Amino acid sequence: MFGRATKEQIDELLLTSYSAWDEFVSHIWASLLSNCNLPRDGVFVEIAPGTSSKIAQALKKINFKGQIYIIEPYEKALKLILDKYQEILPDAIVHPVNHLLNDCFKQLPKSVDCIISHHPLDDMIMAMDGNPQLFEKLFSWVSQNKLEVHQNFTLHWQQLSEQPERLHAIERKVINQWLNLIKETDPGWLMISQYPSLVLETGCTKALNQCAQNLLQKLKSHLQHSLIEEKIVQNILNEYPNYNFDLLGNEVLNSKNWLIYCKQ
């Protein structure tokens, strides 16, 4: 296992509460951001947070007081996360962007200090061909503080997984959108995490976890010449306790599931 071994067992709240999990993971993000010596008054972009405040909490921990653009295509989620950002980071300037990734470039600066995205690829796979009606169908449950997947989400994944050609086309679109984002915004840093979601690890959605992880590896291969070495990232992740829990020790704290890009 990766991470720091402990005799202490994992807190039950981490397995049942989104807010508890967000707080735990925000510490990891804060360490990664601190180790990259990013400007506290810089220009950041967060991609597809949903209603999760992990990144906002991490930015608070590093005393961030710059500008951040939040790209979230699901309008209800954007309103909720905007309220959280304004509460957590009252001194930051927050720009909400209610667009899909490929449609947001005109709303963003031509150069940014850092692009951050926590666990975006599974949702991007699910909603790539989407519209507001699909977002409502798939993600209306994200505001609840309970780890469960709704039936509409599962059914949509089943439909996608039965159409391999369509799924491969979606994967190519996702990769191209990230590469276009880098081209259009010239980020100093790009940071993405994509480990298996505990809530997706049962039933047919377990394959969505694997699909999203594979997609991260493909994106890393496109950017390999500008990536921070995994052993450096691993040293940072190893500072955190794994509680002898498989998801933490083998996935969340495993550098293979993190992409840290630095502009050459």
Put a short name on every predicted segment:
Residues 1-39:
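Class I SAM-dependent methyltransferase Rossmann-like catalytic core
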Residues 40-51:
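Conserved class I S-adenosyl-L-methionine
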Residues 51-65:
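Conserved SAM-binding loop of SAM-dependent methyltransferases across substrates and taxa
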Residues 65-71:
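Short beta-strand element of Class I
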Residues 74-76:
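Conserved SAM/SAH-binding beta-strand->alpha-helix loop
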Residues 82-107:
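S-adenosyl-L-methionine
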Residues 112-169:
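A short SAM/SAH-binding and catalytic strip from SAM-dependent methyltransferases
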Residues 201-264:
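Class I S-adenosyl-L-methionine
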